[in-house]
Curated annotation (Swiss-Prot):
Belongs to the polyribonucleotide nucleotidyltransferase family. It comes from Paenarthrobacter aurescens (strain TC1). The gene is pnp. PANTHER family: POLYRIBONUCLEOTIDE NUCLEOTIDYLTRANSFERASE (PTHR11252), POLYRIBONUCLEOTIDE NUCLEOTIDYLTRANSFERASE 1, MITOCHONDRIAL (PTHR11252:SF0). Residues 585-644 form the KH domain. This is Polyribonucleotide nucleotidyltransferase. The keyword Cytoplasm applies. Mg(2+) binds at residues 519, 525. GO terms for molecular function: 3'-5'-RNA exonuclease activity; magnesium ion binding; polyribonucleotide nucleotidyltransferase activity; RNA binding. Residues 656-728 form the S1 motif domain. GO terms for biological process: mRNA catabolic process; RNA processing.
Length: 750
């Protein structure tokens, strides 16, 4: 875009051997009536417009900051027409909602405290390269437009996604990776922060291991995202954040409006705080030593009524100030006790975990279920399996068009003993479900290993701290109960942070397994999930302007000890996948030639519908010729497979049949033998001893070689149609031919 009124700045992101990215900030051409507006480009082919506006008057009756962040995904940005019935954009996609949360979390603490004017930030995706991820660009765009708006905002805030990508030269943290690059990444992390002196203070982290991380680590030797590696990633993000902040500050210095004086509504005046502190501090110290949540809440409410009643006459008409001051005094009392005495609300030490319980198979008929409890937090996980055609279809700007694993999180009001609205999920529930999903995706079996769509539902039945991490634990339990062959168990823990002035110095204390009150009165909610070997997901939110990376690194190590303890409890409840439920569909796979797909489907679907009607099985066909057959019982699935093979694979090998095959490939675990064109079987190394006079075989090539003819018998056909073979030796053939005369002789003797 060109024009004399346009002003711009650029941030150059240098990824070394992975190339450079250019983030360009522009203002002055579009959305001129907004308080602040900015166009942000990444490499000139992805463009976002961010506009920030503020209400002219404070919202009456509000005791919080009314900030709204919205993302508008325009399908024309990717050259597409929306797939909805009306062919226009409707409600925001899950990706857009998660992007809104990603922007809101670092921006909200940066506004001046006490602001009550409504502020709205709208980011519109105007053009996008299908290989780009726009969410992190949106963080920078929203910060830029807010910087320009004249609002009391302590920006700029920079956001960057860094991914640990491996190539021939090793692993490197790469900023602003593309979708295609993430296929070779083991971990990707969104980090937002601001410049604090000579350093960068971190304000938000959202991170996860990738879908391919397990294979990259276990099979290709890529670096595992341990706590130390993740800490290195936080440090690697800092120079990029600094470059982004400097580019924003440069443009803001030339184009920002003067900061407007907005009315600021302090929660209370100093005289109110002093009176409440004198009346309540000592009693609050006793109240917040009560371990039980409901008893503690009741005692706190009674004390609050008592204090407010005693001071109402002295501060007539200032009841809201009294209430806010009571909360602030409570916060100070709790924090000082933690920092000075190293003792928490319920009497635990800083690293102690509440009592844990884990139980599986808690519901009848469902495919998998479990309950996980951590103190008063209680989560029920329920797993449902179905055909792959039931996976979620996605119509968004992302190149991902389908999702096999779907994680839904529900947080009913009764989980905290309150009343409230139930129904469609709110942004918080969508965000918590997405976090639990990201924690578990790296350990899921592949589509080929487990050809099922998986829906996982987490029901928060009781809440007192970290229901999202409880959902991760409950989901691990219920999926194992459902028979999902997870590559490893995953557990999660929520860490907290308390900081305050003690003896004139700022002290930090990291808390393991935080309560709801510690979350409310603390400075940080830091959730970490992972296996016993590495981290699979992280989410960090802070109420401060930023947290030193060294403090976060220490909290990560502290979280690992807690995670290992929780994994022991999970493994004690269930350590291997159970058998599939009798109520779950049995899914088997058959491979047919691509040119036979039309014959199996038949004219207008006549043939496939007839097979489904006759057998009661559910059939879906992939473009590559893979046919998935699902049925509630084995005979139905086998009947459908036979019917399909009769059409597409009329000469399908059966168990017990013998072939003179040709060795086509040798591996460390056996040899692959071609039986017929396009049909191979595995002759496992343990079977080769029959060809070596019963001796143990350590090297396959010592017994057979490529091109050698071998007489084999089919011993097994698995659900995916793969054949297991056994060699047929001369003695076996001779014994088979001698059996008949021997039996005849025995009969005549009798």
């Amino acid at each position: 875009m060109e024009g004399p009124e346009i002003q711009f700045s650029e941030a150059i992101i240098d990824n070394g051997r992975f190339g450079k990215r250019v983030i360009r900030f522009e203002t002055g051409r579009l959305a001129k009536q907004a308080a602040g507006a900015s166009m942000v480009y990444i490499d000139e082919d992805t463009a976002l417009l961010s506009a920030t506006t503020a209400g002219k008057q404070p919202r009456e009756g509000f005791d919080f900051f009314p900030l709204t962040v919205d993302v508008e995904e325009r399908m024309y940005a990717a050259g597409r027409i929306p797939g909805s019935f009306f062919r226009r954009e409707g409600r925001p996609s899950t990706e857009a909602i998660l992007a809104c949360r990603l922007m809101d979390r670092p921006l909200r603490p940066a506004f001046v405290k006490g602001l009550r004017n409504e502020v709205q930030i709208v980011v519109t995706v105007l053009a996008i390269n299908p290989d780009e991820l726009y969410d992190v660009v949106a963080i920078n765009a929203s910060s830029m437009s807010t910087q320009l708006s004249g609002l009391p905002f302590s920006g700029p805030i920079g956001g960057v996604r860094v991914a640990l990508i491996a190539d021939e030269q090793g692993s490197q943290w790469v900023a602003f990776p593309k979708h295609s690059q993430l296929e070779n990444a083991v971990f990707n992390m969104v980090v937002a922060g601001r410049i604090a002196g000579d350093d960068v203070a971190i304000m938000m982290v959202e991170a996860e291991a990738t879908d391919n991380s397990w294979n990259l680590i276990k099979e290709q030797g890529a670096t595992a995202p341990t706590e130390e590696v993740v800490s290195e990633g936080l440090e690697a993000a800092k120079p990029f954040i600094k470059a982004l902040c400097e580019a924003q500050a440069d443009l803001a210095a030339r184009a920002a409006k003067p900061t407007v004086e907005f009315p600021v509504f302090l929660d209370y005046q100093d005289d109110v705080y002093a009176a409440v502190e004198a009346a309540a501090a000592d009693k609050l110290a006793a109240v917040f030593q009560i371990a039980d949540k409901q008893d503690r809440d009741n005692a706190s409410d009674e004390l609050k009524d008592e204090v407010l009643g005693a001071l109402a006459g002295q501060f007539e008409g200032r009841e809201k100030e009294l209430s806010a001051a009571f909360r602030s005094v409570t916060k100070h009392v709790v924090r000082q006790r933690i920092l000075k005495d190293q003792v928490r609300i319920d009497g635990r030490g800083l690293t102690d975990i509440r009592q844990l319980t884990a139980e599986v198979e808690v519901l009848p008929r469902v495919h998998g279920s479990a309950i996980f409890e951590r103190g008063e937090t209680q989560i029920m996980g329920v797993t449902t399996l179905n055909m792959l055609k039931m996976e979620q279809q996605i119509d968004s700007l992302s190149p991902v068009t389908r999702k096999r694993y779907m994680h839904n999180y529900n947080f009913p009001p009764y989980s905290t003993g309150e009343t409230g609205r139930v129904g469609s999920p709110k942004r918080r529930e969508i965000g918590h479900g997405a976090l639990a999903e990201r924690a578990l995706v790296p350990v899921l079996p592949t589509r080929e290993e487990f050809p099922y769509a998986i829906r996982q539902v987490s029901e928060a039945l009781g809440s007192n701290g970290s229901t999202s991490m409880g959902s991760v634990c409950a989901s691990t339990l219920s999926m194992l109960n459902a028979g999902v062959p997870l590559k490893a168990a995953v557990a999660g823990i929520a860490m907290g942070l308390v900081s305050d002035q003690v003896d004139g110095q700022t002290r930090y204390a990291a808390l393991t397994d935080i309560l709801g009150a510690e979350d409310a009165f603390g400075d940080m909610d830091f959730k970490v999930a992972g296996t016993s070997e590495f981290v699979t997901a992280i989410q960090l939110d802070t109420k401060l302007d930023g947290i030193p990376a060294s403090v976060l690194a220490a909290a990560l190590k502290q979280a690992r000890e807690a995670r290992l303890h929780i994994l022991e409890v999970i493994n004690a409840a269930i350590d291997t996948p159970d058998e599939l439920s009798e109520f779950a569909p049995r899914v088997i796979a058959v491979k047919i030639p691509v040119d036979k797909i039309g014959e199996v489907i038949g004219p207008k679907g006549k043939m496939i519908n007839q097979i489904q009607e006759d057998t009661g099985a559910d059939i879906s066909i992939e473009d590559d010729g893979t046919v998935y057959i699902g049925a509630t019982n084995g005979p139905s699935a086998d009947a459908a497979r036979s019917a399909i093979n009769a059409i597409a694979n009329p000469q399908v090998p059966e168990i017990g049949e013998r072939y003179l095959g040709t060795v086509v490939k040798t591996t460390t675990f056996g040899a692959f033998v071609s039986l017929t064109p396009g049909k191979d079987g595995l002759l496992h190394i343990s079977e080769l001893r029959k060809l070596a006079n019963g001796k143990r075989v350590d090297n396959v090539d010592d017994v057979v070689s490529v091109g050698q003819k071998v007489q084999v018998e089919i011993t097994k056909i698995d659900d995916r149609g793969k054949l297991s073979l056994s060699p047929v030796v001369a003695e076996e053939e001779g014994a088979a031919s001698e059996d008949a005369p021997a039996e005849a002789a025995e009969e005549s003797a009798e």
